[in-house]
Amino acid sequence: YIIYMPSQNQLNVANEFGKTFVPDYSGEITINQKFGTLTAGKLSKVKKVHIEFSAGNIIESVSGGELDIRFSRTQVNRLEGKVKAFFEHNSGLKLVIDNALTELTIKNSFTQLLIDANKNISASFTIHTNFSELDNKSSFSFKEEGNDEDRRGPKFDHDYSGKSGAGNIPVKIKSEFGEVTIGHN
């Protein structure tokens, strides 16, 4: 189906077992995509994007709202505004962040998460991992809190903090059983 409508109207998209293509859209949008791929342009007023059991998803830009991605492979080329994200059992997830972001909160489980951060981003990072670790491939400096070299036995929980630029944008990540990589490209 091809649907033509004004791009500033509210839109709710629900699709199972099919491909969905949404071009740049300036109205409030909710997307629920299952068992098919999602390709989207710049989504200016996101209420919620939910993707489940899908591979090869590409979203050019998400501005605000909530991302909920499960059992999928997805790339988001730009996050803007205040975004809350929930990721579970994904086979690969890449998020690109820069100074268009105002706040990012991520809860991640069983997903290898790649954060591609612009070198000039002004962010303060707070990262907690459980049965996983932070792989810092960026030029930013991260410090592991409570890193006691004299401690005996395994350590399953890790707390990291880091800052780039003035640290204006809060980025909070909680990850269980999923490595978090922060890098540039």
Over which residues does each language-model region extend?
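Intrinsically disordered, low-complexity terminal regions
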Residues: 1-185
